[in-house]
């Protein structure tokens, strides 16, 4: 989950060394661990006619075109401006939030990943609050749905 999330949210391909430093202890075999995790991800993500994991040179990227990933949908909407979204889109986005970002995932021996994870959780929490704020402002004041979102 950690590897997928990091690659999915990365704006560009990520170096293998960076991923190894981020996710694994150096004394172990981080490149071996990375290869193993990539093989597991390929089994889940790749389609018969499309490889979703791209490994140009010494970097790794995900090809998620045509795939709906909640975190990417939220980040994309935030980049365009939450205040510009209509009521239906705000409702759809608010439904994507279920707990914290990568809830339950902690990697004790990876302080760099944990720092990234905390930053992402703060970012998504902020977006969630903004989405709910704009959603409630667009609902009629007597809407039953308003109390659900205000909670």
Regions of interest found by a model, annotated:
Residues 1-23, 41, 102:
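Short amphipathic alpha-helical recognition elements used for nucleic-acid or partner binding
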Residues 1-5, 27-46:
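DNA-recognition element of transcription regulators
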Residues 20, 38, 150:
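Generic structural marker for isolated residues within well-ordered, non-membrane alpha-helices
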